[in-house]
């Protein structure tokens, strides 16, 4: 199956690269309308995934990742329209000059070619990934999780129906409907067809892709995000930020999983936070010995807890004596995604932003803002936690490479 699908997307990538900006934008606008028109059809297929998930006893938080409602489908359509309105990076000239030999040298943006996307649970990723790849002249091979197979299949069917209506080869998007681990590993090693592979999901998925892939990988997604509440923090502000980052949507990668508190304010802040956060939703605190003394309820934290992406109403807590200790702790356990400090000390804020090794580092704000739309990129294909090629929310430019065009008049060397 991989051989067949890989050849289709590889062949289609040549046509995708030739599409004009107007053709791409018109198609994305029509696809947005089509999603809304097919809302009932999409919800009907999504219901099969939801029923299967509930039958397997999956938590409500994880079921919510699968769920497509009329509003979420409308949001997906809005995302398509926003991508259509973004500037097209393909063909953009980054630099141009004439060298001492008289050669005219131009560097411009070009598509990556064929993109492989392996992801879990969220069917909206199907639309996000396709829209960004299509806008940048790439073809894409998608492999979603078995838990969202019916949703992913109907979304790709709708995309393909619209491609055929627009007389664009439908090979610019293919879905690996065999969700077995064996087929996934074949996809990870399909380097004769795929130019890049982007995994988006759990730490287990991403680590498996890194271990097995021969296709170049852009690592995304694992979000063990931490908030440090400094001794000078406004405790009301800190409480609001932590509650938002932990409870607003705990199943996403930019939710806070860990809290670090300065010892000088721990006895005042931790009881206040625990009281206020439990009014929103009961949260389990997994805390070190010092933090437990300030909490009315909690369980002892293990080292593993400080590096864990819970994706649930669970928060690890660490009390530290100073900023340096906080930075050391965060850099030790961080997934390099998003970290935040709540402080009124300008120098501590600057030191934190300078020394924390993460894609996004906040001062006095929730980690929940790490998102392609918020950062002005439109939809995102993922949030890269590595440093090569792309880092942070990956928008259109992250799905491009560059090419040098050199014009001469007989020069030799």
From Swiss-Prot:
Signal peptide: none annotated. SUPFAM superfamilies: ALDH-like. Its EC number is 1.2.1.41. GO terms for biological process: L-proline biosynthetic process. It catalyses: L-glutamate 5-semialdehyde + phosphate + NADP(+) = L-glutamyl 5-phosphate + NADPH + H(+). Gene3D superfamilies: Aldehyde Dehydrogenase, Chain A, domain 1, Aldehyde Dehydrogenase, Chain A, domain 2. GO terms for molecular function: glutamate-5-semialdehyde dehydrogenase activity; NADP binding. It is an enzyme of class 1 (oxidoreductase). This is Gamma-glutamyl phosphate reductase. The gene is proA.
């Amino acid at each position: 199956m991989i051989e067949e699908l890989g050849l289709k997307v590889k062949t289609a990538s040549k046509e995708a690269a030739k599409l004009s900006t107007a053709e791409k934008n018109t198609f994305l606008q029509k696809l947005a309308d089509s999603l809304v028109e097919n809302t009932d059809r999409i919800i009907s297929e999504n219901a099969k995934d939801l029923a299967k998930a509930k039958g397997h006893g999956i938590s409500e938080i994880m079921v919510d990742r699968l769920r497509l409602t009329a509003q979420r489908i409308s949001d997906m359509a809005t995302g398509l329209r926003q991508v259509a309105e973004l500037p097209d990076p393909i063909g953009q000239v980054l630099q141009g000059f004439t060298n001492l030999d008289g050669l005219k040298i131009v560097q411009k943006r070009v598509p990556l070619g064929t993109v492989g996307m392996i992801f879990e649970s969220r069917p909206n990723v199907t639309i996000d990934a396709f829209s960004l790849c299509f806008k940048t002249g790439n073809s894409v091979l998608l492999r979603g999780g078995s838990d969202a197979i019916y949703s992913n299949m109907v979304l790709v069917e709708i995309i393909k129906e619209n491609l055929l209506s627009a007389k664009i080869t439908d090979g610019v998007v293919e879905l690996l409907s065999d969700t077995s681990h064996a087929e996934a590993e074949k996809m990870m090693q399909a380097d004769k067809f795929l130019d890049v592979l982007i995994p988006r999901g759990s730490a287990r998925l991403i680590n498996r892709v890194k271990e097995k892939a021969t296709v170049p990988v852009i690592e995304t997604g694992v979000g063990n995000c931490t908030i440090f509440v400094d001794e000078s923090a406004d405790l009301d502000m800190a409480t609001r930020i932590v509650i938002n980052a932990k409870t607003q949507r705990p199943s996403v990668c930019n939710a806070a999983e860990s809290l670090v508190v300065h010892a000088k304010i721990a006895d005042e802040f931790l009881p206040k936070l625990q009281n206020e956060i439990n009014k929103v939703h009961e949260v389990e605190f997994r805390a070190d010995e010092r933090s437990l003394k300030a909490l009315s309820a909690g369980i002892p934290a293990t080292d593993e807890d400080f590096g864990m992406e819970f994706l649930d109403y669970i928060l690890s807590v660490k009390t530290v004596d100073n900023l340096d200790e906080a930075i050391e702790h965060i850099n030790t356990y961080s997934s390099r995604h998003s970290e935040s400090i709540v402080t009124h000390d300008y120098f501590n804020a600057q030191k934190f932003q300078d020394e924390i090794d993460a894609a996004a580092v906040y001062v006095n704000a929730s980690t929940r803002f790490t998102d392609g739309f918020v950062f002005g990129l439109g939809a995102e294909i993922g949030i890269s936690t590595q440093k090569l090629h792309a880092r942070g929310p990956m928008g259109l430019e992250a799905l491009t490479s560059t090419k040098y065009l050199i014009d001469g008049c007989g020069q030799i060397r």
